[in-house]
């Protein structure tokens, strides 16, 4: 790796206006919040939490640009460029590399039943075109793509595939990957399983709720690495109470409402997502007060 990419990252939220356009000022505020308030190590930009798959190519570039302008070189930046359109993925990868992103990431191609060889070559083609480091984004519950340990081995043989964002509940496979590839980067993608992932030896984590709950995630991560498992679990219980409540109200509009409570112009989710339901206002206010969000 050209740069140490270990640590905790916010899966950056993106604010939109009523017309579905990116709210640049609000995006800068959200990005800065992750550094100044949540004290995270980096940003994972244009992932699921950024509602990436609802954006056109120019909007994705806009998000990359504004996030980079907001944080400069203060934290590490990973650009998620995955797309069903390989040409778009390459275009985005080149752009993010040119403006200074530390690494690329790409979700596995989804919807169509691609063969592993097609998936492998998709990654190799992006790397060849961009000459940047690549982090595989494995999220089988949403893509339907399960990568075996043998297939991970074939991918990791490429020197520029430096790691994986592992968003899966299969901790046996996670342990196997960690044992087989001790020098590869593993970033956990399930906020609700941070203790278990840390015990399994991940190098960090990427989370949507870290936009508002990053400090608690940091404590969980540090305590688990230090062997203080019961203390880490107690904080994980608190985090999971937060996550459960947020999910019940709609994750993206609710996280944006928590940011709005902090005075951040967090905008709206992009349609067809609905805005925050005011019927949940009392529940949200109680959540913010109870967990100091």
From Swiss-Prot:
Question: From which domain of life does this come?
Answer: Bacteria
Q: What does this protein do?
A: Catalyzes the reversible aldol cleavage of N-acetylneuraminic acid (sialic acid; Neu5Ac) to form pyruvate and N-acetylmannosamine (ManNAc) via a Schiff base intermediate.
Keywords attached to this entry: Carbohydrate metabolism, Cytoplasm, Lyase, Schiff base
Question: What is the enzyme's main class?
Answer: lyase
Binding-site list for aceneuramate: 48-49, 167, 189, 191-192, 208
The molecular function terms of the Gene Ontology recorded here are: N-acetylneuraminate lyase activity
Under the heading CDD domains, the entry gives: NAL
- Provenance organism: Staphylococcus aureus (strain bovine RF122 / ET3-1)
Q: Which InterPro entries match?
A: Aldolase_TIM, DapA-like, NanA, Schiff_base-form_aldolases_AS
- List the catalytic residues: 137, 165
Q: How does it assemble?
A: Homotetramer.
Q: Where in the cell is it found?
A: Cytoplasm
* PANTHER family on file: N-ACETYLNEURAMINATE LYASE
> Which NCBIfam families does this chain map to?
PRK04147.1
Quote the cellular component terms of the Gene Ontology held in the record.
cytosol
Q: List the protein's name.
A: N-acetylneuraminate lyase
Q: Which family does it belong to?
A: Belongs to the DapA family. NanA subfamily.
Q: In which pathway does it act?
A: Amino-sugar metabolism; N-acetylneuraminate degradation; D-fructose 6-phosphate from N-acetylneuraminate: step 1/5
Q: HAMAP family, per this entry? A: N_acetylneuram_lyase (MF_01237)
One Pfam family name from the record?
DHDPS
Catalytic activity entry? aceneuramate = aldehydo-N-acetyl-D-mannosamine + pyruvate
For the biological process aspect of GO, one term held by this record is: N-acetylneuraminate catabolic process
Keyword Hydrolase carried by entry? no
EC number(s) recorded for this UniProt protein: 4.1.3.3
């Amino acid at each position: 790796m050209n740069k140490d990419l270990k640590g905790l990252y916010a899966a950056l939220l993106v604010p939109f206006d009523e017309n579905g356009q990116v709210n640049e000022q609000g995006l800068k505020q959200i990005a800065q919040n992750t550094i100044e308030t949540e004290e995270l190590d980096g940003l994972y930009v244009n992932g699921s939490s950024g509602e990436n798959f609802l954006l056109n190519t120019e909007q994705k570039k806009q998000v990359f640009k504004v996030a980079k302008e907001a944080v400069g070189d203060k934290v590490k930046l990973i650009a998620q460029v995955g797309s069903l359109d390989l040409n778009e993925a390459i275009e985005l990868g080149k752009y993010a590399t040119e403006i200074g992103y530390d690494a690329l990431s790409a979700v596995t191609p989804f919807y169509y039943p691609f063969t592993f060889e097609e998936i492998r070559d998709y990654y190799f083609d992006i790397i060849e075109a961009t000459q940047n480091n690549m982090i595989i984004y494995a999220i089988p519950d949403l893509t339907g793509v399960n990568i075996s340990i043998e297939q991970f081995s074939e991918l990791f043989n490429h020197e520029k595939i430096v790691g994986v964002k592992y968003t899966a509940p299969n901790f046996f496979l996670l342990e196997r990957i960690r044992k087989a590839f001790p020098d590869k980067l593993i970033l956990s993608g399930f906020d609700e399983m941070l203790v278990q992932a840390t015990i399994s030896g991940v190098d960090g984590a990427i989370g949507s709720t870290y936009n508002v709950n990053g400090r608690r995630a940091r404590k969980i991560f540090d305590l688990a690495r230090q062997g203080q498992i019961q203390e880490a679990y107690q904080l994980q219980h608190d985090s999971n109470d937060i996550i459960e409540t947020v999910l019940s109200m709609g994750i993206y509009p609710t996280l944006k409402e928590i940011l709005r409570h902090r005075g951040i112009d967090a905008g709206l989710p992009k349609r067809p997502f609905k805005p925050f339901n005011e019927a949940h206002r009392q529940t949200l206010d109680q959540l913010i007060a109870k967990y100091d969000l």
